[in-house]
Amino acid sequence: MSIRIATLFSLAAVAALAASPALAAPYQKDDTYKNPAIKAGGSLDLTNLVGHVSVVAASDGVLAVDSHIVAAAGNDADAQTLAGKLKIETKVDGNAVEMMAKYPLDDYSTYYYHDKGFDGFGMNNTTTDYDGERVRISSGSFGSGANLHVDFVVHVPKGVHVTVDNKVGLIESAGVDAPQNLKSSSGDIKSDHGSDSFEAHTGSGDVTVSDQAGGVDMETGSGDITLSRQKGGDVKVETGSGDVKLHDIAGGIHGETGSGDVELRGATGSGADLETGSGDIVLDNVTGSLKLRAGSGDIRGTDLKAGQVVETNTGSGDVTLSGDLGDVVRLSADSGSGSIVIHTKRVPSMHISATSDSGDVDVDLPGMQNVSVRHHSFRADVNGGKGSAELEAGSGDVTFTKD
């Protein structure tokens, strides 16, 4: 479990920073671990407290891990001594490798990481469990603690399952043809042109994936999620607070945010199950069954090629759907406060029930039978009435027409 606290800079912090002793040039130590015996079906498990981890394809087919230890102190000798206290522990068991960066936790419980990706001036504090100890990391343009970290470049052969747990810092992956599980307590995770299954979980940070051939599971406690050009498996994405953007997706989709907008553009899979506690849901050029829920926000879908089920619900907002709903057998749209507008190119076979507590109801479809019109309500069968449509607006108009 980790806690991340964003700390704004102050005049006092600037003064303290200016008064602190100047650090010598960082001492850097490089090493490479190679194991040609690890083949497809094997695994690598890498754990690091703080730093930047890159995961790339092994061009020569050999598992290799490059480590780059960086330490800074008041003088070169102290920096070299500090760097020497960080060890890389490696365990091999058959076709599996475990590597862990062993920090001098008996000497230091607080570390500073000059995060080059930090936006602006200030720092973040992350408290996390590592190697059986409680550790605090200050990251940003300034901070306090032992100035010590290690960066890794992991060269992954095809089919070797890689797990990275990098508590603080960026994780990047590019061109890897293997299952991946990337985890961070506080840091962004990025991947492009990967194959096989992909998992990414961060406590705080953005997750961005593009050109992925395989199933995807992405989660962040606080941050945006972006996935583009995915095929070959289902998609699960979740953020506690942040936007979700999905473009050109081939798999079935489950997406959720506690607070933020959800955008899905271009989907050819079995359908989408999307939810936001507070925000809009926007779909364009989407195929399959749909379950869309917004606690507070609009639901808008255009150029839909709907499957058998379309369910939409918003506590406060409009529901607007257009496209081909001809294959739908169960349609429901519910808005506590807002209008419902549905336009379809093909008319489905269904019994329609449309009501509004305080608004107009306009259903105009060809071939309607058994029509019943009452104050703020409408019922009818269309195309044989095999399926059902339940349209209900607490406050707003209801419209259902053929384009």
Question: Which functions belong to the PLM regions below?
Answer:
Residues 1-403:
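Intrinsically disordered, low-complexity terminal regions
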